[in-house]
Swiss-Prot record:
Name this protein carries in UniProt: Phospho-N-acetylmuramoyl-pentapeptide-transferase
Cell compartment(s), UniProt: Cell inner membrane
Transmembrane segments: 29-49, 76-96, 100-120, 137-157, 193-213, 225-245, 262-282, 289-309, 314-334, 369-389
Cofactor(s) it depends on: Mg(2+)
Membrane disposition: Multi-pass membrane protein
UniProt gene name: mraY
Pathway field: Cell wall biogenesis; peptidoglycan biosynthesis
Keywords per UniProt: Cell cycle, Cell division, Cell inner membrane, Cell membrane, Cell shape, Cell wall biogenesis/degradation, Magnesium, Membrane, Metal-binding, Peptidoglycan synthesis, Transferase, Transmembrane, Transmembrane helix
Annotated catalysed reactions: UDP-N-acetyl-alpha-D-muramoyl-L-alanyl-gamma-D-glutamyl-meso-2,6-diaminopimeloyl-D-alanyl-D-alanine + di-trans,octa-cis-undecaprenyl phosphate = di-trans,octa-cis-undecaprenyl diphospho-N-acetyl-alpha-D-muramoyl-L-alanyl-D-glutamyl-meso-2,6-diaminopimeloyl-D-alanyl-D-alanine + UMP
EC identifiers of the protein: 2.7.8.13
GO CC field: plasma membrane
Amino acid sequence: MLLSLAQWLQSISPEFGSFRVFQYLTFRAVMAALTALLIGLLAGPFVIRRLISLKIGQPIREYAMQTHLSKSGTPTMGGVLILMSIGISTLLWFDLSNRFVWIVLLVTLGFGAIGWADDWRKVVLKDPEGMRSREKYLWQSLIGLVAALYLVFSISESSNLRVLELFFSWVQSGFDVDLPPKAGLLVPFVKEISYPLGVFGFVILTYLVIVGSSNAVNLTDGLDGLAIMPVVMVGSALGVFAYVTGSAVYSKYLFFPHIPGSGELLIFCSAMAGAGLAFLWFNTHPAQVFMGDVGALALGAALGTIAVIVRQEIVLAIMGGIFVVEALSVMMQVIWFKYTKKRYGEGRRLFKMAPLHHHFEKSGWKETQVVVRFWIITMLLCLVGLSTLKLR
C-alpha cells in the first residue's frame, strides 16, 4: 500500500524523489518487521485484557502434566494478535500486485479461521474435543488443495491470466502438461538437480507440506514460547530464500530457480518475525497468553506455503526439524500403542508422553530447559538450511 502511494507521489512531483527508498525490498522488509513488532507490543495488553474479559481461558485436561495445571484459565486464542500484526504490516509494506503474497495471506487466514473455530468450540462452547478431526482435516484439505492447484501453474507463469490459460490447457489436454524444471522438487546440497514432479505430484506434495506443516506447528505449541520462536527462525530463513529466488542475479549465481515475484515474500516473512517476537514478549514463561490453534495452524500453513513457492520443501523439513520430530513422535506413539494393544492386549508407549516435549518434561527437564534447548536446535538447523545456499 505504501509502495503504491510512494510511486504515485513520485509521479506527480519530483519533490517526492526521496520516496524512491520504498522501492527497495530490504528497506520495506525491515519496516515490515518493525511495524508488526510495534503493533504486537502495543495491542498485546489490550488483546489479553479483552480475552480475559470474555473468559477465553485455556482448559487443561486432567491427564496433562501436573506442572501445567496452574496454567488453567490463561487466555488463549492470542494467535489473533499475531495474525492482526502480520496482516496489517504486510498490507502496508508489500507490493499489492504481488500474487504470491496474496496467496500466502489467504492460506494463513484460512487456516487461522479453522483454528479459531476449533478454539471457540473448546473454550467458549465448552466442547473439550473442539472441531472433530475429520471436519478439521476436511477444511484444511480444501484450502490446501485450492492453494496447490493455483501454485502448480503460478510458479512458472508471471500473471494470473497466464495461470488460468495454463490451467485450462491442462484440462483440455487430458491433464497432461509438462511443468518447467523449476517446478520440480529441489534437492539441497546438490547443484542443478531437481526431481520432476508433474502436475499431480506437485499438487500432492504441496498439499502435504501445507497441511503437514500446519499440524506439526500446532502439535509443537505445548509449552510457553516453544513454538513461536522456531516459527520466527524458520520464517526468517525462508525470507532469505525468497529474496534469492526472487532475484535474477542471486538465483543465477547460487544455482537456484528464478521465480519472479517471490522476493516480495520477504515482506511477509519479516512481518511474521516481528509479530512473533512481539507475541513472545507475552508468551514467554510464565505465559500471559497462548496462541491457540488460531495462531499455530495459521503460522504452520504460512511456512509450508512459502516453502513451496520458493521450492524449498526439503529445506523446510530440515530447518523445521523440531516440528517434524514433534509430529512424528505423536504418530509413532499412536501407531505403537494400537499395535501393541492388538497384539498383546495391552497398549504400550514408545515415549513417556507425546508430543516429544512432554516426554522430556517427564524425564526431569524443566519447562524452560525444554523450550530453550529446542530453540537452540532450531537455530542450528536453520544454519544448516541456510548453508544450502552455497553448499551445492
